[in-house]
A protein has these predicted regions:
Chain A
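Hydrophobic, membrane-facing alpha-helical anchors
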Residues: 33-41, 124, 352
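Extended hydrophobic/Leu-rich segments
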Residues: 11, 17, 34, 39-40, ...
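Alpha-helical transmembrane segments of polytopic membrane proteins
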Residues: 27-38, 72-82, 171
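A structural signal for multi-pass alpha-helical bundles of membrane permease subunits
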Residues: 100-407
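Short, flexible coil/linker elements and helix-boundary hinge sites characteristic
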Residues: 24-27, 49, 98, 233, ...
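Transmembrane alpha-helical segments of polytopic membrane transport and secretion proteins
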Residues: 1-12, 18, 22, 41-58, ...
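Alpha-helical transmembrane segments of multi-pass membrane proteins
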Residues: 15-22, 117-123
Length: 407, 404
């Protein structure tokens, strides 16, 4: 027997999951009955050979759970519970290997079950939704194949606006953030006094909630009474509602007129980026500092003996040996850029003037929860998913080759 | 690494100090604004030290607060009199004192039941406000008009705003009997009363803590099985868990919203907690910890007849406390700071988390930046306090996340 016990447990849990799917209207009563009967049959099979009273009791509890589960879904939990009652009787008669099989599954099932219900199945469900026409809570929707994708990719300027913004977000925040963080981390790693205090100050923004942080920056950016306008001597400048691209703004005095994508991110979006860099910098510094402290001191000592300058040491020892950490941060920031939401919502609640601060996450929120167009939003989510996947793979292929993993 | 001694050192410290000043400035500005009156917050030239932080005003605030209610939190209780002195030197036109009524109110018991007496003493006007009604009040807002013909005048408690009205100056206090704490923390108290922040805090703490504890329990079980128990199908389970890592959060927003609505769980604590209970990050982190423990420990326990369950509870868990702390901090931070998910799955004010409450408050507070910054400060306070208490764990946890 042995693995039979794990099978019995597994089918019991599956029966509960199917009961849940029935409740969610993804499965019918028939499939629940099938799963429950399969679980009980596996139970009978497991009992074969060693019919103990407790095992029969467990089976009886499972049977009761199956029946009760018809009315009250959560009572179907009695089915796996019955397995444990049975196990109680069996435990002494079971081999070491079989015990492992049973306990292994018993311990991973809660996590696996939750991941299945809240992550794996929903991911496929999102894919399915994206093939429907205007799915929401009202009325029926029909299967339209790739229509949503076609509209999204070929006829939706806002999607491309959001894509462009995401591109600029990555192009600005990632190099500037990682560059600044590397500089600060290298300086902090010089035996400075008060290192702890500096680290505390740099790290503080990262643990502050984005909502509160964005509220403060909104106040700093305030056109009339904001600190920034006082500091720069630009009273009344509308930091958060100037849709003009920054490249266009910089180059206009030279007689160069840029428009569309090449005008660059709007002033408002750059203000959002500045706030985002500030927020995330402490995290990058702490991670890089840990990376720096992992570099063996001997390299520097050897370099010093050879008369290397400070810059040479940074360029030829620190930078290459820090590259795995930098790569990790790069990947993380790239994925993070696709999820920028909170600071945009607080700083420019409507997505800015002319949607100039629209990000993919904000667009998804607007489509899904303001326009209640779940299918279109799902199509958007799937596209984002594929893009992240492709980017991560490309990154692995192209960038990771330049990463020095071994010292 | 050693820089060229002196010049290098100076450069390093200059850059570090400048950088930390920029990093810390928004916090200072939030705190400073949260202690300012509206007029002070809206100065063309920034006010670096708010009036409410000056000890000279505290004594007056305490005295006036004690007259109206208590020395600490002030008030305007039934039967009490609050006396304001306006030092003018000579006797000129009598200052006019009124209690402003809130706009769109039919009657204001505070203004109606207050007796105002003005008398000139030796070089000062003594204005006495007596609460003749049965009702006690938290605040005593007062407006005073004083003729511009006085060359100078001095007040015990600095007014919150001064504006010009024809021949007069109009001075106003949002609370003339504040008490020390009521004076300094005026915006905090008003923000606290303006929205149910207590409830918001409870929701945030409750959901975040449940997520941490439940998630820890589930992740520890799975991680232990994956690290220490040989069982058929282990590789499959492991690759399933790795696969879920690739699913970005955005993909799950809509389907999970629909699932929750079909379960009837929208706008409940379940919606805030259950979908994020199983954490792949936690499973990986703890599995790494359990793998680093020596196998002998578990073999010894097995020989002594310990089941897998008690191996998990008696050996693996106590030895992986640092990992659990890291996981706990991250999960708590994530749950406490989240805005998007609570925004989607809750809609009644009772279910709002603190971030959502703050977001709603931003809409309501309008241009009252003092109250807004006070609310922001309140919302980050628990995390910042926790950070200062457990700084090492925070920083190590983050550092650990970056090293493979």
């Amino acid at each position: 027997m042995g693995t039979r016990l794990a099978l019995y447990l597994g089918l019991g849990v599956v029966a509960v999951l199917v009961r849940l799917l029935w409740e969610l209207r993804f499965a019918g009563a028939g499939s629940y009955a099938l799963a429950a009967v399969a679980a009980l049959a596996a139970g009978l099979w497991a009992i074969q050979g060693k019919p103990l009273p407790l095992a029969w009791l467990g089976l009886a509890i499972g049977l009761a759970g199956t029946v009760a589960g018809y009315g009250l879904p959560w009572l179907s939990l009695l089915i796996p519970l019955g397995v444990f009652v049975g196990y109680w009787g069996w435990a002494r008669h079971v081999s070491e290997k079989d015990l492992g099989a049973f306990w292994g599954w018993a311990l991973v099932w809660p996590a696996v079950g939750l991941l299945l219900v809240w992550q794996v199945i929903p991911a496929f469900y999102a894919l399915w939704l994206s093939f429907l026409d205007r799915f929401n809570f009202i009325g029926h929707s029909r299967f339209v194949g790739l229509l949503n994708y076609e509209i999204l990719l070929t006829r939706d300027p806002l999607f491309w606006k959001a894509m462009g913004n995401t591109f600029w977000f990555v192009a600005f925040t990632v190099p500037i953030g990682i560059g600044l963080a590397t500089l600060m981390a290298i300086l902090l790693n010089e035996k400075v006094k008060l290192q702890g205090l500096f680290r505390t100050l740099y790290f503080l923004p990262y643990i502050t909630a984005l909502t509160a942080a964005a509220a403060v920056w909104d106040w700093i950016y305030n056109p009339e009474f904001g600190f920034l306008n006082w500091l720069l001597g630009t009273p009344g400048f509308q930091w958060l509602s100037t849709p003009e691209g920054i490249f266009a703004r910089i180059l206009r005095p030279l007689g160069i007129n840029l428009s569309g994508f090449w005008a660059g991110p709007s002033v408002a979006f750059v203000a959002v980026m500045a706030m985002s860099i500030w927020h995330f910098l402490g995290y990058q510094i702490v991670v890089l500092l840990a990376g720096l402290q992992n570099i063996p001191k001997e390299y520097y000592e050897a370099a010093e003996l050879d008369g290397a300058s400070w810059w040479q040491k940074v360029r030829f020892i620190t930078w290459p040996l820090l590259s795995p950490t930098t790569f990790f941060l790069f990947t993380l920031s790239l994925i993070g850029a696709f999820q920028v939401f909170t600071q945009v919502l607080i700083l420019t609640p409507t997505g800015g003037v002319l949607q100039d601060t629209l990000t993919l996450a904000l667009y998804l929120y607007n489509k899904g929860f303001r326009d209640s167009n779940f299918s279109y939003a799902s199509a958007l989510a799937v596209v984002v998913f594929i893009m992240i996947l492709v980017l991560t793979l490309v990154q692995r292929r192209v960038l990771e080759r330049r990463v020095t993993y071994e010292a | 690494m050693r820089l060229k001694p002196l010049l290098g050192q100076i450069t390093v410290y200059t850059v570090l100090i400048a950088g930390s000043a920029i990093m810390a400035f928004p916090f200072y500005w939030m705190l400073a604004t949260s202690l300012k009156s509206p007029q002070e917050a809206q100065q063309a030239v920034p006010v670096w030290v708010p009036e409410r932080l000056k000890p000279a005003n505290w004594a007056a605030a305490a005295r006036l607060g004690a007259q109206g209610g208590s020395m600490w939190w002030g008030g305007y209780r039934a039967g009490r009199s609050v006396v304001l002195r306006v030092y003018t030197g000579e006797k000129g036109p009598e200052p006019v004192v009124t209690i402003p009524t809130p706009p769109a109110a039919f009657s204001d018991p505070r203004a109606d039941n207050t007796r105002i007496e003005t008398a000139f003493e030796d070089g000062w006007w003594e204005v006495t406000l007596t609460n003749g009604g049965q009702e006690s009040f938290r605040l005593l807002p007062v407006r005073l008009r004083i003729a511009k013909s006085y060359p100078t005048y001095r007040l015990e408690l600095q007014p919150d705003s001064i504006s010009s009205r024809g021949e007069d100056w109009e001075l106003s206090w949002s609370n003339l009997a504040p008490g020390v704490l009521g004076y300094v923390l005026h915006n905090f108290r008003e923000a606290w009363y303006a929205a149910p922040f207590g409830r918001y805090f409870f929701n945030s703490f409750f959901t975040a803590l449940t997520q941490v504890l439940g998630g820890l329990f589930i992740a520890a079980m799975a991680a232990f099985a994956l690290a220490r128990i040989p069982f058929p199908g282990k590789e499959f389970v492991f690759s399933l868990i790795i696969a879920t890592l690739m699913i970005p959060g955005e993909v799950l927003l809509i389907p999970n919203y629909i699932l929750l609505s079909r379960l009837g769980w929208l706008d409940t604590y379940y919606a805030l907690i259950v979908p994020w209970l199983a954490s792949v990050f936690g499973i990986f982190l703890l599995r790494q910890f359990y793998l680093s423990l020596p196998q002998d420990l578990f073999d010894a326990a097995r020989i002594d007849g310990a089941t897998y369950w008690s191996q998990l509870w008696r050996i693996a868990l106590p030895l992986s406390v640092p990992g659990m702390v890291t996981y706990g901090i991250f999960t708590f931070l994530g749950a406490y700071n989240a805005l998007l998910w609570p925004l989607i799955v809750t809609n009644s004010p009772e279910m709002r988390t603190i971030q959502l409450g703050l977001q709603a408050f931003i809409g309501e507070a309008g241009s009252d930046y003092g109250a807004l910054m006070a609310a922001s400060t309140l919302s980050i306070l628990p995390i910042v306090l926790g950070y200062f208490l457990a700084q090492k764990q925070f920083v190590q946890g983050v550092a650990r996340s970056g090293i493979k």
